[in-house]
Structures are given as C-alpha cells and as structure tokens.
Amino acid sequence: GHNPAILMKKDGSHELLETGGPVLGVFDSFEFEQGKFALGDSLLFCYTDGVVDATNNAEEPFEMERLVDFLKTQLDSAPSRICSGLRRELRNHIKDMPQLDDMTFLVLKK
C-alpha cells in the first residue's frame, strides 16, 4: 500500500497529499484524480506502508507521528542523508524483529 505522500514545509508543518487513487499498476484501467502543489523549499516524502507499520518486539509500529517528527529534524538535510537517517531510525526501532513488509521511500527537495 502507498500512504499519502507527506509535504513537509520549512516551518515544520506538514500536509498529506491524498489526491490520487489506488496503488499504481493494480488495475488495468482507472481514472486517477489529479492534484497540484508547489514544492518550493518544502520536502516531499513518498513511502509505502511498511515504513509506518514497522513493528518492534513490543508490537509498537513506527507510526506516522514518529515519521513526521523525524522528518521535522531533517528539513535542512540532503535527501541521501534523510534516507540513510530514516533507515537507521527504522533499524533502531525494530531491532531484531524480522521485516514483515517492504519499506520503500523517496525524498524530493529542490
């Protein structure tokens, strides 16, 4: 599953980009809603549900709030540093638990 992309603004606020449709490639034909936004000096974070669903041995998922809090600390970082930092945060969270779902994410910045 693909959760709504997160547009992280320079002031630390964020917006979920929910316009669209189902995951790409599942249906032969489907009309997607089209939306627009200006990236400006914001950060765009696209990800699969495996990121927020990553669970530790106490059965606590990583969750959206923890993801947004992490992204707030990375607003001035390069996309590659954000990705490596998030991989580290996820590993620290799940520790020795097996990865149960894919964790795919993409960071875009100007």
Residue map of PLM features:
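Conserved subregion of the PPM/PP2C metallophosphatase catalytic domain
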Residues: G1-K110
